[in-house]
Amino acid sequence: MSQRKRYSLNVVTSPSIPSPTPSAPIRTNESNWEAASPASAASSFLPNVHHGGTVLNPGLGIMRSPSLNKSGAFGRSGSSGSSTVIEPSNIKLLLIGDANVGKTAMILSYCRELLTRAEMSRSVRLRHQQQQQHKDLGLKKTVVNHRLSMKEKRKRYSSNDFEKEFKDINHFADETSDFGNPNIGDDNNHEMADPNEIVIETRSTIGIDIKTNLVNIDNRFFNVILWDTAGQERYQNAIIPSLYKKTNAVILTYDITNAKSFQSCMERWIVQALENFSSQDLLKARFFLVGNKIDLYKERQVTHYDVVQMVQEMQLKHGIKISGNFEVSCKWVNVVERTMNMIILDLVENGCFENNDPCVSITTSDDVQGHEQEFHDTVEEPFNFTRQRQHQLEKNNTVDITKPNDDIANNQSICCV
């Protein structure tokens, strides 16, 4: 009885077949989106309504938008280049003249990079504070390092050695605090100075310095490139050929307190410019004469008569025209800026710039005057638009007893009424 086999009653049932999971049809051809109806497309993305014992509202189907990889989906421009960014046109200004006439200061003044006396003192004070912070930080690190080294080696030293180490640290701290603590100017000497006065502290140019400035003229941008050249002859031999290439304006700079620099413009600089200009670049170049340091008018050595005489002599001797004559001071920012703007406007009006916009043609003031003259020559007589007013003859209802009354209807004259 103990070995009797026991059986259990198991009901054999068919295995449950899982319901198919909903799968969204993958449409590879984008043209099928237009062919499929909205109802069928919405129902294809809906799960089985009886699956899981839940019923979903068919109106909540999620529609996938077609791919936006088609051309023109995002309004992109084609390869025609219509959406390319137009670069601003270039205007090259070349400043030449003797050394120490103020070419660098003029460029910095136009770019507003010269500091006033208050800004200069503030920058010096800030620089001194930064240096002092670095020195204090270095001193703290030195003291900490000494203490750590002493702590590591305290068993190797005696009390006399500790006293010696502390004396060395104090001596080093005193030297560091005293070092690099210069007096920032004499406050008594600068109490009466104007804090808004521009301080001109420039160094002699070695080679070439280039500054750029972007200007907007009638909603058109121009990239003004200012070339600052070295006045000393030893720095010019290697760079002369590349100076005058594609130059639009040559600014002859001189010092009104130095007659020698004024004569050099006639005897040296204008000759050098004409020798190195190519015939093509010379057609688009204009010459200007600028005198600097008019704030030192009491020390003037170059008079206005000398300037006018030199301009006439340049036109007769070299056959060039001086397009403008100016006098500026780098300490007066508005004067330098107005002078440079007048030079730039003159260049733009005469088409002396490198046009980077192919859609805009260069039109000079001479061309405009030529078209106006041609228009006036074609018209022999002026247009006289006169309008004559015609008066309608109204019949007079009054009767003049001194004249016979004409009967127009019967073509007869009646003496009386």
Swiss-Prot record:
One of its GO terms (molecular function) is GTP binding. One of its GO terms (cellular component) is cellular bud tip. Belongs to the small GTPase superfamily. Rab family. The gene is YPT11. It is a lipid-anchor. This is GTP-binding protein YPT11. It comes from Saccharomyces cerevisiae (strain YJM789) (Baker's yeast). Residues 1-34 are annotated as: Disordered. GTP binds at residues 97-104, 228-232, 292-295. The lineage of its organism: Eukaryota, Fungi, Dikarya, Ascomycota, Saccharomycotina. SMART domains: RAB, RAS, RHO. Disulfide bonds: none annotated. Involved in the positive control of both endoplasmic reticulum (ER) and mitochondrion inheritance during cell divison. Required for the MYO2-dependent retention of newly inherited mitochondria at the bud tip in developing daughter cells. It is found in: Endoplasmic reticulum membrane; Bud tip; Bud neck. A lipid is attached at C415, C416 (S-geranylgeranyl cysteine). Keywords: Endoplasmic reticulum, GTP-binding, Lipoprotein, Membrane, Nucleotide-binding, Prenylation.
